[in-house]
Amino acid sequence: MNALQRDLKKLVPLVESLGAEKAAADPHRQRFHLQPPVGWLNDPNGLCVYGGQYHAFFQYGPFDVNGGVKHWGHAVSTDLLHWEQLPVMLYPDEPFDCHGAYSGSALVEDGTMYLYYTGNVKHPGNFDYIKEGRGHNVCLAVSKDGVTLDSKQCLLTNRDYPAGLTCHVRDPKVFAYEGRYYMVLGARTLEDKGEVLVLESTDKLRWTHINTLTTPEPFGYMWECPDLFCLDGQWYLAVSPQGIDCQNVYGCGWFAIHGDWRRDCTLSEFHELDAGFDYYAPQSFVDGNGRRIQIGWMGMPDADYGNAPTVAYGWQHCFTVPRVLTTGPDGTLLQNPVPELDAQRSAAALHAASGEEVFLAPRFDLTAAPAGDFCLTVAQGVQLVYTEQDCTCTLRFTDPALADGRTVRRARLAAPCRSLRVVGDNSSLEIFLNGGATVFSTRYYPAPGDVSVKLTGAACELCNL
């Protein structure tokens, strides 16, 4: 242990203990979403199963509610809904990660947890920090108990990446496949084109670039947080592209891969994962039941809206409810809350007729089977309006007090809406349409106490969570 890590190990728990009471007093503190003890949270990292528990790491700024230097926060759960915070796993305490232990992934093998992450280094000087002045290193931390580190090392630096790239190469996702190990890295070229590098290894340490995944025409200048996975025999690439034309500052979605991603392949058209205000940098993993589970950051970088109500209590952001990924008949990715959420539903369901306003705790689960136009209103200031004629769904804040700058988001459904599910927590709404084919995620900030819910155009069932 070096001196910096020794001191950070003392300082972070102190900061957390000093801010814990204030954060806990926030009425907008979430009940079943992973959130930081204090400070800032963004990307999910290192999602895995280890020792009979789910492990989730997260980009964590304990010293700054608006970001700051990034650590890897750490939490465990047995049901994906109730999380126990553990001590920070990765500190920015080495020359190769001194400006932040940035995003990455976990590989669990033979009782050992391998954490691959981006070591961020910003060199002093008059640099643009895009084409020069920054180091994005692929680093490896190893743990034999899932809690403490046995080693950290730098595996790759910018000199090891292919020619023609900027300094921005990051977010390693590592997995085993057909007797070898593979890594995908998000990258930005010198021509400002986003792409994903595919690397191969036989020993988890030495890596060789074997392919690059991209589109024929530029699609954004940077592809962040790549995730490469197979469902029902079809391979998918999920990325968070920056610089595309979309409703949010940055996009988030998936391509279907046609061909062998290790050699020669093409990408399908891009499909948005979430049409809401707050969804970015999702990652997925396979659990012990063979389910592919995806978790996203319920936030958005560089957005012109915020979370001032929680910032006032010394914390900001959370993860989404974990979602099981499946495929539809046409290969479309479907997202639905993990079934563990069903066990949290109250035994007594409330049945509301069309147009009937009900009041209940903000932690609720609503289901409905609409057959035409409908309008859902939550807390008398958040509306979801569906128009059957053009299969368009609009999420709109009509009360600025709930929004902290959020306004309107829209999505066109591929088919008429015949199922609606809304999962509410103390300061979030996650909306699943047509069995998870279209999803909206947003934070919102209702007054303390019960919230009103009214669905016009269909009857609905509501349960407390």
Task: Tell where the protein language model's regions lie, with residue ranges.
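Beta-rich accessory regions
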Residues: 15-20, 256-465
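Beta-rich carbohydrate-recognition and catalytic domains
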Residues: 1-171, 176-219, 230-275, 298-347, ...
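Repeated scaffold domains used in trafficking and secretory/extracellular systems
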Residues: 221-226, 279-282
